[in-house]
Every structure is written in structure tokens, then in C-alpha cells.
């Protein structure tokens, strides 16, 4: 480390790069919002279908994006008497 570097300002490139990455991630998330919800819905249905039978029309997946936090809301109407699937050994 030279004496000149000791008194110089730290490079702002890493901070700018990090800010740009956050901005790009936010932009991508806002454009792919509907695709992400559809993919999540199908994956959640696949996992639940391994264990019980449900009506696919009775599942609701909603994503709300806020400034500081995003919320994923999943509503699943389960039948009163469920038929558990037995795993083959």
C-alpha cells in the first residue's frame, strides 16, 4: 500500500455495481411477477398432490410487492375427508 493510496478516496465502482445489481433484480422481478406466481403455483400444487388429492381450482397464489418486503399468500381449500396417497416402497 503506497502513501498516495492511503489518502485517496476508496473506489466507488464496487458500490455502483452493487446498486446496479439491486436495481436490475428489482426490475426483473417486476417484469416476471406473473410468471413467477404461475411457476410457484404449479410447484406448490405438485408437492401437495404427492400427499393428498385437492381440486386445482381451489388453490389461490398471490404475491404482493412492497417497498421493503414482498408477501406470498397461498390459499388452499382442503376437502373435509382427504384421501392420503400411499407411497410405494
Curated annotation (Swiss-Prot):
Matches recorded under NCBIfam families: minE, PRK00296.1
Biological processes per GO annotation: cell division; regulation of division septum assembly
Gene3D superfamilies, alphabetized: Cell division topological specificity factor MinE
SUPFAM superfamilies for this protein: Cell division protein MinE topological specificity domain
Encoding gene (name): minE
InterPro entries linked: MinE, MinE_sf
Keyword entries, A-Z: Cell cycle, Cell division
The family this protein is said to belong to: Belongs to the MinE family.
The name this protein goes by in its record: Cell division topological specificity factor
Domain of life according to the entry: Bacteria
Function in brief: Prevents the cell division inhibition by proteins MinC and MinD at internal division sites while permitting inhibition at polar sites. This ensures cell division at the proper site by restricting the formation of a division septum at the midpoint of the long axis of the cell.
Amino acid at each position: 500500500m503506497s502513501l498516495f493510496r492511503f489518502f485517496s478516496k476508496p473506489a466507488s465502482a464496487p458500490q455502483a455495481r452493487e446498486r446496479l445489481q439491486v436495481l436490475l433484480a428489482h426490475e426483473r422481478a417486476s417484469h416476471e411477477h406473473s410468471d413467477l406466481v404461475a411457476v410457484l403455483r404449479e410447484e406448490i400444487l405438485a408437492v401437495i398432490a404427492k400427499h393428498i388429492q385437492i381440486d386445482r381450482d381451489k388453490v389461490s397464489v398471490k404475491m404482493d410487492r412492497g417497498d421493503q418486503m414482498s408477501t406470498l399468500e397461498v390459499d388452499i381449500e382442503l376437502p373435509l375427508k382427504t384421501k392420503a396417497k400411499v407411497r410405494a416402497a
